[in-house]
Design a protein with these regions (language model features):
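Structural motif detector for alpha-helix initiation sites
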Residues: 108, 125, 228, 295-298
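Alpha-helix boundary recognition
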Residues: 91, 130, 192, 208, ...
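ABC-family P-loop ATPase nucleotide-binding domain
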Residues: 1-27, 308-315
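ABC transporter nucleotide-binding domains
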Residues: 18-21, 28-199, 204-218, 224
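Short, charged/small-residue-rich alpha-helical element at the C-terminal edge
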Residues: 237-309, 315
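A generic structural signal for secondary-structure junctions
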Residues: 80, 89, 111, 120, ...
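ABC transporter nucleotide-binding domain
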Residues: 182-272
Length: 315
């Protein structure tokens, strides 16, 4: 019988939380391209870690190394206390990758039954179908599903083995808002059961809502790491939301404004300092309404960090 994550990986004799996945000084090259450069990265038991970065930053490479699908050129890769290719460790991990290819002629329930047969202690098929919101699609062939429905099947296949460590690479791509939030709730429930989740996503709101810790990777290097609030605190910016008769071009010309977005009837204005921009706005439009000022979000912090990294020559 394989011990559970709670038995062997969550605490040591001193009660400290244990690392269940790590990259230590890892370098990975694809020919002349260096995808990861001396990366040090850890995932602790019972947490959700979001790995964020632009396209080509090294996120998927890092995940594939931890899954044992790639080998590092140098450095050490550890998962659940050992080699990621170890069969016992693979029994305790689940993965949902961006490119998940399964036979299109099999029905949803058949896929779940097939994948469950690979594991020693799988979840009941009914529980997997419910967790992925697939109860009404269990007899549908995979090839007849929409893109969002296929994503939900791939999530079901990732969790059917009752994994202790779950890798989710862009899990909510193609999902509508309701389905995305349902998946978030399922991830929270898994963590509540003692599971550990490593998540990559382009949806910054998703990382903000789910992650205990965020690591930002750019051009193969980890450039920032901390809780979502700690990452956001690294960017001293403000977000101004208002309803105004001013045009978007006029708003963009106001000194101190770094970005303007239209959001239904209102505008969202980003700036390092709110007060001078507010004075300018009110001077230009005395009828301005719906005014809200808030701290910069994770998206602004992410953009600032990756742009600064590129400017400083982190290649």
């Amino acid at each position: 019988m394989i011990a559970t994550l709670e038995e062997v990986s969550t605490t040591n004799s001193a009660g400290a939380v244990q690392v269940v996945a790590s990259l230590e000084g890892v370098n990975k090259n694809y020919g002349e391209v260096q995808a990861l450069k001396g990366v040090n990265f850890r995932v602790r038991a019972g947490e959700v870690v979001a790995l964020l970065g632009p396209n080509g930053a090294g996120k998927t490479t890092a995940v594939k190394l931890l899954l044992g699908l790639l080998q590092a050129n140098t450095g050490k890769v550890r998962v659940l206390g050992g080699d990621p290719t170890n069969p016992e460790n693979r029994m305790r991990t689940g993965a949902m990758l961006q490119v998940g290819r399964v036979p299109e002629t099999l029905r949803v329930r058949e896929h779940i039954d097939l994948f469950s047969s690979y594991y020693q202690n799988p979840l009941p098929a009914a529980a997997v179908l419910a967790a992925a919101g697939l109860e009404n699609l269990s007899e549908r062939k995979f090839g007849d599903l929409s893109g969002g429905q296929r994503q939900r099947v791939l999530f079901a296949l990732a969790i059917c083995g009752n994994p202790d460590l779950l890798f989710l690479d862009e899990p909510t791509v193609g999902l509508d808002v309701e389905a995305r939030r349902m998946l978030w709730e399922q991830i929270r429930q898994l963590v509540g059961q003692g599971k550990t989740v490593l998540l990559t996503t382009h949806y910054l709101q998703e990382a903000d809502a789910l992650a205990d810790r965020v690591a930002v990777i750019n051009k193969g290097e980890i450039i920032a790491e901390g809780s979502p609030s700690e990452i956001k605190a690294q960017t001293a910016g403000k977000r101004i939301r208002c309803i105004t008769s001013l045009t978007i071009d006029t708003l963009r010309q106001i000194p101190g404004v770094t970005e303007v977005k239209e959001d239904r009837e209102a505008f969202e204005i980003h700036t390092p300092e709110a007060e001078p921009v507010l004075r300018d706005l009110l001077a230009r439009d005395a009828n301005l309404s719906g005014l809200e000022v808030s701290a910069a979000g994770l998206e602004e912090a992410f953009l600032a960090l990756t742009q600064d990294s590129s400017k400083n020559g982190n290649h």
